[in-house]
């Protein structure tokens, strides 16, 4: 398959940016899904030792990818301990 892509790129050089952007988009999507699977507190890989990982988060833990106007270092805890 890689040989076909290289052959098409040699025959039609205008396809090179298309291949670059499709490759970058696929790589970015794969990295984002990997980040969600490994670092998101909603995902539990070990149900016996840590069945509810979201309960161990403190109020200062930022697990969002990007936060516009919330400063997580200044938040106070509002809920009860579990």
UniProtKB/Swiss-Prot annotation:
It holds the Pfam family B12D. InterPro entries: B12D (IPR010530). Residues 38-82 are mitochondrial intermembrane. It is a single-pass membrane protein. The modification Phosphoserine is found at residue 67. The modification N6-acetyllysine is found at residue 10. It is found in: Mitochondrion inner membrane. Keywords: Acetylation, Electron transport, Membrane, Mitochondrion, Mitochondrion inner membrane, Phosphoprotein, Respiratory chain, Transmembrane, Transmembrane helix, Transport. Disulfide bonds: none annotated. The chain crosses the membrane at residues 15-37. GO terms for cellular component: mitochondrial inner membrane; respiratory chain complex IV. The keyword Transmembrane applies. The keyword Mitochondrion applies. Residues 1-14 are mitochondrial matrix. Belongs to the complex IV NDUFA4 subunit family. Component of the cytochrome c oxidase, the last enzyme in the mitochondrial electron transport chain which drives oxidative phosphorylation. The respiratory chain contains 3 multisubunit complexes succinate dehydrogenase (complex II, CII), ubiquinol-cytochrome c oxidoreductase (cytochrome b-c1 complex, complex III, CIII) and cytochrome c oxidase (complex IV, CIV), that cooperate to transfer electrons derived from NADH and succinate to molecular oxygen, creating an electrochemical gradient over the inner membrane that drives transmembrane transport and the ATP synthase. Component of the cytochrome c oxidase (complex IV, CIV), a multisubunit enzyme composed of 14 subunits. The complex is composed of a catalytic core of 3 subunits MT-CO1, MT-CO2 and MT-CO3, encoded in the mitochondrial DNA, and 11 supernumerary subunits COX4I1 (or COX4I2), COX5A, COX5B, COX6A2 (or COX6A1), COX6B1 (or COX6B2), COX6C, COX7A1 (or COX7A2), COX7B, COX7C, COX8B and NDUFA4, which are encoded in the nuclear genome. This is Cytochrome c oxidase subunit NDUFA4. It comes from Bos taurus. The lineage of its organism: Eukaryota, Metazoa, Chordata, Craniata, Vertebrata.
């Amino acid at each position: 398959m890689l040989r076909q892509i290289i052959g098409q790129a040699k025959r039609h050089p205008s396809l090179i940016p298309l291949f670059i952007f499709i490759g970058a988009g696929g790589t970015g999507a794969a990295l984002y899904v990997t980040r969600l699977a490994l670092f998101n507190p909603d995902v539990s890989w070990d149900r016996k030792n840590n069945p509810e990982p979201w309960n161990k988060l403190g109020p200062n833990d930022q697990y969002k990818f990007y936060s516009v106007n919330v400063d997580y270092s200044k938040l106070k805890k509002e809920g009860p301990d579990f």
